[in-house]
Amino acid sequence: MFGSLLLGIATLLGAIYAFLVSNFGHWRRRGVTEPRALPLFGSFPNMIWPRQHFTMDMRDIYMHYRNTHSYVGCYLLRAPKLLVLEPRLVYEIYVSAFSHFENNDASKMVDIAKDRLVALNPFVLEGEEWRHQRAVFSTLLTNGRIRTTHAIMQRVCLDLCQFIAIKSAGGKDLDCIDLGLRFTGESLFDCVLGIQARTFTDNPLPVVRQNHEMSAENRGLAIAGAVHGLFPNLPRWLRPKVFPRSHDRFYGQMISEALRLRRSKHQERNDFINHLLEMQRELDLSEEDMASHAMTFMFDGLDTTSNSIAHCLLLLGRNPDCQRRLYEELQLVNPGGYLPDLDALIDLPYLSACFNESLRIYPAGGWASKTCTKEYELRGSHHSEPLKLRPGDHVMVPIYALHNDPDLYPEPDVFRPERFLDGGLKNCKQQGIFLGFGNGPRQCVGMRLGLAMAKAALAAIVQRFEVVVSPRTLNGTELDPLIFVGVHKGGIWLQFVPRKNVTTK
């Protein structure tokens, strides 16, 4: 009896082991070098056992092979992924050969029947549906419509600075991840929904808490990633729900209320929600479709923009000379601490350079994963024969590793905005070494709105306060291994010293 039990356990363990390693060798059989992969953990063990952020696993592989290989075969748990190391090939995948890699792997993780609020988000859509929804959002995000949000951003920036002045009085530390979420939450709710979220008051809508649950505490996202890694070909209807139901209820109710109020008041504002109502009449959209369209702005802008603001403030606080130069640029455009008009703000070269350099050091997404949609020959400089990629093959781009490669960016840990002045941004994007917002036709759909918000917040803060790093903030640029989206480990705690002769009112 005991022997039979042991045999059964051994058989079960053997079957599990065989399942976990069954895909290993997929790339080797196609002539591609494979770094060591472990059962269950795959090539990126810190995704399961997070001693450091798992993008560091990609960076380690990248640094080991970049001078001898253009790509290597890796495994996300047990899902085969081709890790592309050569920047020229990265540019091909994103831009020149885009038609062969037009789908994001995120579409394989999300069941849009379960997560209806992201059902129309271009990031998770494929093929013709992606093209259609991308066109819809292009009409929503015109320069003219973004300009109409500037008055709202001016009001929110004033509230932001008053909040900072009160909460940081006496040299108190401020949690800048929280501060960024308050700003983006207030901005997006008013710009998109016409609702003031009151995030800088003592009685706010629970925007910050809901977003924290969606990102930092979202077990559904981690589970969906693990399921995709273990069962890469799982049918869509078996995929788990990604976003918390509390998140669906909160945003669903807010969006429905915003639509109801706008209809009842018959307001004519040239803003996003007014255009959504026009689209509903023209395209016969359901309330669920309307909510999904509105939620795309929230999903794409809340977390990534707030983190980018916080990281840029951290780096400016660590580099007083850069902060001083940015302050002088802002004063030349609009002395007195008032926010410049949107066109002037967007075009400020040093502000743009500071923001892009912070995105280089702390990219909003540390990696990207694309799906081959048409057969393609990948011709790497380090390989004599091209690799034939087939539809369904997945390629990964190690964005964090590219951004922090000392051969591409000398002294990558040093905050040096000058890298992105005088055509530096265009040059880096064309080389395939800067992917702060992605690149090519599938670059971030909300990029212009996100840039407008981030630059408005940074300009307002730097003109009114000197930013100083608190001793509570850890040195270095290590990412928190427990948060899926890359955030500075230990939080970002800063102090804000009011500048002389500048009002915060």
Curated annotation (Swiss-Prot):
GO cellular component term of the entry, any: endoplasmic reticulum membrane
Subcellular localization: Endoplasmic reticulum membrane; Microsome membrane
Molecular function as annotated in GO: heme binding; iron ion binding; monooxygenase activity; oxidoreductase activity, acting on paired donors, with incorporation or reduction of molecular oxygen
Topological type in the membrane: Peripheral membrane protein
Keywords: Endoplasmic reticulum, Heme, Iron, Membrane, Metal-binding, Microsome, Monooxygenase, Oxidoreductase
Enzyme nomenclature, EC number: 1.14.-.-
Binding site for heme: 444
Cofactors required: heme
Main subcellular location of this protein, as a coarse class: endoplasmic reticulum
CDD domains assigned to the protein according to its UniProt record, in alphabetical order: CYP6-like
The keyword Iron is assigned to this record: yes
EC class: oxidoreductase
PROSITE patterns membership: CYTOCHROME_P450
The protein's role, per its UniProt record: May be involved in the metabolism of insect hormones and in the breakdown of synthetic insecticides.
PANTHER family cross-referenced by the UniProt entry: CYTOCHROME P450 (PTHR24292), CYTOCHROME P450 28A5-RELATED (PTHR24292:SF84)
Similarity comment text for this entry: Belongs to the cytochrome P450 family.
Protein name, UniProt field: Probable cytochrome P450 28c1
Species name: Drosophila melanogaster
